[in-house]
UniProtKB/Swiss-Prot annotation:
Gene3D superfamilies: RnfH-like. InterPro entries: Mopterin_synth/thiamin_S_b (IPR016155), RnfH (IPR005346), RnfH_sf (IPR037021). It holds the Pfam family Ub-RnfH. PANTHER family: UPF0125 PROTEIN RATB. Disulfide bonds: none annotated. It comes from Haemophilus influenzae (strain PittEE). This is Protein RnfH. Belongs to the UPF0125 (RnfH) family.
Amino acid sequence: MNQINIEIAYAFPERYYLKSFQVDEGITVQTAITQSGILSQFPEIDLSTNKIGIFSRPIKLTDVLKEGDRIEIYRPLLADPKEIRRKRAAEQAAAKNKEKGA
């Protein structure tokens, strides 16, 4: 069976894990992730909750890989971006009201 070259990436705030390797043509994303060994290196990765993509495009674990694909495993968000914006806006409004009252 023919082999294809792929990469698997997992990013942290302070560092980046990237591994290049060859897999059999026709392999699925999930099988490649399992074969890469990344799940034993980073036990916090949970394929049922972590989002997965190829070059920033969301994919399914059942998708078949192509030559040169880079599987990206995304960490869960620590906070909801909408909630952070609401909180920041409320804090800024409170600060403006305080300045007007002073």
